Design a protein with these regions (language model features):
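Ankyrin repeat (ANK) tandem alpha-helical domains that serve as protein-protein interaction scaffolds
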Residues: 1-142
Length: 142
């Protein structure tokens, strides 16, 4: 298997652009794509429920582990098991922290990973909105 990637592979500038992309800022997503970091733009979009971006990560990119990360953030048990199996320890901790796992959140705080904590907080907001949006009876199709 090819070398697996991690969010720790990226410098601060790119992670800040990723954070802004998570917030939906198209300028930052375009910046990531223009600078050959389409995988970060796709991950931001996949976390925001873009199924085409998720499909691209999983099947067409060299970053399927980021597609698995998106699924793990959504709580898919097989994705969590995949991250464990392939020893993607940081991505696993990240996904668990995004799911509000106390031990994982404490690990990020203990290691003073402030930027990752900011990203995790943004993903918490996204997941909360997605949960609210899916339970809104006014949005359901019958």
């Amino acid at each position: 298997m090819a070398r697996l990637h991690s969010l720790t592979d990226y410098d601060t500038k790119l992670l800040l652009a990723f954070l802004e992309g998570l917030k939906g800022d198209k300028n930052f997503l375009d910046f990531l794509i223009a600078n050959n970091f389409a995988e970060l733009a796709a991950l931001a979009n996949a976390i925001n429920s873009d199924t085409e971006a998720l499909e691209w990560l999983l099947k067409k990119s060299n970053y399927p582990e980021f597609g698995v990360l998106s699924n793990a953030i959504d709580g898919e048990e097989n994705a969590i098991e995949w991250l464990k199996k392939y020893q993607c320890d940081f991505l696993l901790k990240f996904a668990l922290a995004c799911r509000k796992d106390d031990e994982a959140i404490k690990w990020f705080a203990k290691n003073d990973l402030k930027l990752f904590i900011m990203i995790i907080q943004r993903i918490h907001e996204i997941l909360l909105f997605q949960s609210w949006d899916s339970s809104d009876v006014h949005r359901r199709r019958y």
